[in-house]
Every structure is written in C-alpha cells, then in structure tokens.
Amino acid sequence: MKKIALIILIITTFKTQAQDRVITTGVPFLLIAADARSAGMADMGVATSADAYSQQYNPAKYAFSLNGQGFSMSYTPYLTDIANDISLGQVTYFNRINERSAFAGSLRYFGLGDIELRQSFEDTPRTVSPNELAIDVSYALKLSEQFSMAIAGRFIRSNLKIPDGTSDASAASTFAFDVAGFYQSEEEAYSDFNGRWRAGFNLQNLGPKIKYDNDVTNTNFIPSNLRLGGGFDFIFDEYNKVSVTGEVTKLLVPTPPERTIVEPVDSNGDGTIDNSEVN
C-alpha cells in the first residue's frame, strides 16, 4: 500500500509540474477532428481504414481506397458552451489516378464568430470576424502491394489580429508539409473470421513558425506532431467488420523551460530589500 501511495504521489507531483510548463502553438485548429469517426475514436485516424477524410490524418491511405474518387463535406460546431457561432468546416476531394497512386485536396476553415468592439457602452459597436484557414494538397503512391507513402503540402492563413487603429492587423500566413506512410496486409483466413493488419505514421505540420504583426519577435510554433498507430480488422463477412486500433501522438514543439523564482533575501538584516539584494 505504501508503494502504491508513493507512486501516486510521484505521478501527481510530475503532473503538477508539467501543468506549469504548458505548450502553446499557433493555429491549433489544425488538430481539431473534422469527421465523426475520428472525433468518436479520440482523434484516431492514422492507421484506420481509408475514407474520404484521410487527408487530415494519413493521406497515404488514399492509395488503398476501394473507391476511385470521393468527396466529403463536414461542419463541426466548436466550444458551444462558450459561444454558438464558433465552428470548423472542411471540404475534401480525392481521386485514385490508377491502381498505385492518388491525389487529394482539401479546404479547412475555422471561424470564431462575430466579435463586437467598442470603447464604451454608448459607442456603436464595430463587428469583426476572426478566422483561420488551411489549403492542403497531397499525393500518395504505393511502394508495394501492402505499403504506401504520401506527402502533403499545406498553406495556412491566420486572421486573428483585431485592428485597434494603432497596430498592423494583417493576417499571418505560413506553410507546412506532412510525410506519411500506411501499411495494410492481405486479408488472411482464420478459424472463424478473416483478418487484416494495419499500421501507419504521419509527421504532420512540419514547417516554419507563424509570424504575427510582421514582427520577427512575435512568432509561434505551428502544431508539428508525430502520429503512430496500428490495428487489426476482424472481417466476418462482406458487410460486418470489427476493428481494434491503437494510436499515440507526440507534439514536436519545444516545452517551455522551467522557471525558477528566486525569493529576495534581506542579506544585511536592515529590514529592507534594495535592488542590490534582488537576484
């Protein structure tokens, strides 16, 4: 019992220290799930079967799509407990050029609704609508019958700066790319069912920082991350399948350094602390 209590204490202490070093990035809307399947599976998608929304999690899956082409459109209300006009919309199209390759394109738009600005209660409000968007293009190629890779390019535009009449309110923009891979085994016969293995990886949002206000000192990392996953399909017949999938995600941006607060000390004992005694 003492060992268990000690382990819990260590984990709690580590968690408390980690919360003091919160990692923040620009354009976090890139990590919001746009489709119902991924959202319902805790943002998993790098090693699931191919669908029209594979662009966000692993475009290499398009090379294994059973459909020659596909189109998807989604609308996701976001943070509805805070506001009723924050939402994410996405449109995606993919096309299998041949048996080995496919390309896809998508547009993702994140709107933060209308915000009223006024200097005082009596002023006539001025309405602004901050928003962010990303345009993606990807190409997938089968390197073998069971493995494919893909590369995706992404243009990102963030228009969050609220003009105040004294500073530049131009939108910030940057670019990023993804490198992804997907493995899918041949369907194998077991005693009571057929089965198939899946695995995937994706290095996402690799690119330079995003710069706001045209100021080189006011920059933010974009949410670069690594996704790894694997799974197995229990295939009972043409219409019934159960999939077991597991994935891990690692954010690839620096963790803020620990800050040490030095308490001032009255070294000479005179009851006051001057600047020379503050480190």
Question: Where is each model-derived feature located?
Answer:
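Bacterial Sec-dependent N-terminal signal peptides
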Residues: 1-22
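Subset of outer-membrane beta-barrel
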Residues: 19-279
